[in-house]
């Protein structure tokens, strides 16, 4: 952050902790309201008037609520995550898979973390996959191949990707990912 032209000027003007706290509060408010376009437009309007996140009503309180939710997810990951030879995985029941997958990756110590959530209305699992910096496999390509072979679809970046997999194929998806990661 420090080596970017705008950021380096701002960090000369403001205390680093001040900037980091405001950035964190803003991030939690954006993520927590990601489906509330009215609130997001309100944020844009306020920020475009050069207001800081700490100056906006209830932003700290909302960020605290979001942190509490993340702590609950982390606790559930610690209790429910399964570790295989080449990856860790977990079915998510009450939050989004993309919110849990980073905890699965980080808590497990594995190079690959997978979180998946059933979409009962569609008969599929929504899958999020993350790789550590030391993961040598392009996960987006691997996920695309494996999910397609199982009647789903997916892909993405080398360290962050996702898929949709038919409900009855999720266990096979995880097994195939574990197997193919081991053969690379």
Predicted regions and their residues:
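A structured phosphate/pyrophosphate-recognition subdomain
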Residues: 1-95, 103-110, 116-119, 176
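Glycine-rich, acidic loop segments that terminate in or are immediately followed by a histidine
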Residues: 6, 86-184
């Amino acid at each position: 952050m420090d080596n970017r032209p705008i950021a380096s000027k701002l960090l000369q003007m403001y205390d680093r902790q001040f900037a980091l706290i405001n950035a964190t509060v803003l991030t939690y408010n954006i993520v927590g309201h990601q489906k509330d376009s009215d609130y997001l437009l309100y944020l844009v309007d306020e920020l475009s008037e050069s207001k800081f996140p700490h100056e906006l009503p209830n932003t700290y309180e909302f960020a605290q609520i979001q942190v509490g939710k993340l702590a609950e997810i982390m606790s559930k990951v610690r209790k429910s995550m399964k570790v295989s030879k080449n990856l860790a995985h977990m079915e998510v029941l009450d939050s989004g898979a993309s919110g849990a997958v980073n905890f699965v990756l980080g808590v497990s110590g594995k190079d690959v973390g997978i979180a998946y959530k059933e979409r009962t209305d569609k008969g599929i699992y929504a899958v999020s996959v993350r790789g550590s910096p030391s993961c040598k496999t392009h996960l987006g390509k691997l996920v695309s191949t494996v999910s397609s072979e199982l009647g789903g679809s997916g892909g993405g970046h080398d360290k962050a990707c996702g898929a949709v997999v038919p409900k009855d194929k999720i266990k096979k998806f995880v097994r195939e990912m574990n197997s193919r990661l081991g053969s690379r």
